Amino acid sequence: SVFQSLPDSWAIKQIFPIMPIHRLLERPTREGILSDITCDCDGKIEQFVDLHDVRHTLPLHDLHDNEEYYLGAFLVGAYQETLGDLHNLLGDTNVVSITIDPVDGHFEFVKEIEGDSVGDVLSYVEYDPKLLRDSFKRKAERAVREHLITPAERREIMEAFEKGINGYTYFER
């Protein structure tokens, strides 16, 4: 979420360096803006740092089927995360800090922080994931007793529930 991770981009029109972080040896062939899932129309970034000025689009590559495409937003720190807090209840994103060796250009992951799970965000707003899990399990067991679902379906449903509540709040493949 732009609101969550880059609040100054919409609040004071701060421009952060943003670029693809792979396929760096390929020339981008597309132009685009960034837009996210928000409750209003401000969740977009339409200004990007260029070598000499500001661009209104971001150079991007064609997407390939079944291939992830990642962008990095740089010079984002704890201040942005603190301001973003829990807007839209999407939680914190995964964050990585890197250093780049100025001599050979190689990079090193200095610190990796995993973003919030659905259970984390639910607990922030006073819902107990364990109580939700127990309640859901009781309902699934009752559905088996009442012959609404089979024991195998109950197991699949509970596995999906666990995967969901322990999963990341943002879309994952």
PLM features: residue spans?
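Charged (often Lys/Glu-rich) extended helix/loop segments that serve as interaction or gating elements
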Residues: 1-173
